Regions:
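N-terminal accessory segment detector
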Residues: 1-101, 111-126, 131, 142-163, ...
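Short loop/turn segments at strand-loop or loop-helix junctions that form parts
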Residues: 104-108
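Conserved ATPase active-site switch/coordination loops adjacent to the nucleotide-binding site
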Residues: 139
Length: 170
């Protein structure tokens, strides 16, 4: 087995665990509580996730002071978190001087697919883009998301894409 296939297998396993956790919370507690718990877990995890990612990439806190440095870090962080078999359906482009543009291929967001199977996509609060926002919060970087998907954009509009505009000091 290649390192690529093992890494992809393990990362997909983590996403399956995440999905099954949400599914069981949904069935036990209802959609509102499952959404709230999911977002609370994401927010709680983000500081640890960013600290570990920075350590693995040899980046010191406070050193992401330019947009190119931040953009490179965020792309590498996403590459570490998402399995390649899923990441190939997600496209991030950098729009200097301050914008990350994201887009999922139509119907290919892993959360959309899982939540659709669970039968509650019409009431799901997007956790994927929320997680990226929490990463910026954990890094202490001001940003805004346009549009900011509180619900599942793929379900509502047939696509999921938007911009994250950052405001670095200086």
């Amino acid at each position: 087995l290649s390192q690529y296939s093992i890494r992809d297998y393990l990362a997909r396993g983590w996403l399956t665990h995440d999905g099954m956790w949400f599914y069981n919370a949904l069935n036990t507690l209802g959609i509102e509580t499952a959404n709230a718990l999911n977002r609370a877990a994401i927010r709680s995890m983000a500081p640890m996730e960013m600290e570990r990612t920075m350590t693995m990439l040899g980046i010191t806190p406070g050193s992401l002071t330019t947009f190119p440095e931040l953009a490179d870090f965020m792309i590498r962080a996403l590459d570490m978190v998402l399995p390649a078999s899923i990441l190939r359906h997600y496209h991030a482009t950098i729009q200097p001087p301050d914008t990350f543009r994201w887009e999922w291929e139509p119907g290919e967001c892993f959360a959309y697919k899982g939540i659709k199977l669970a039968g509650c996509v019409d009431r799901y609060s997007c956790g994927v883009i929320y997680r990226i926002g929490c990463w910026f919060d954990a890094l202490g970087i001001e940003y805004r998301i346009e549009p900011n998907p509180d619900t599942c954009m793929m379900h509502e509009k047939g696509y999921c894409r938007g911009d994250i505009i950052v405001n670095l000091p200086g």
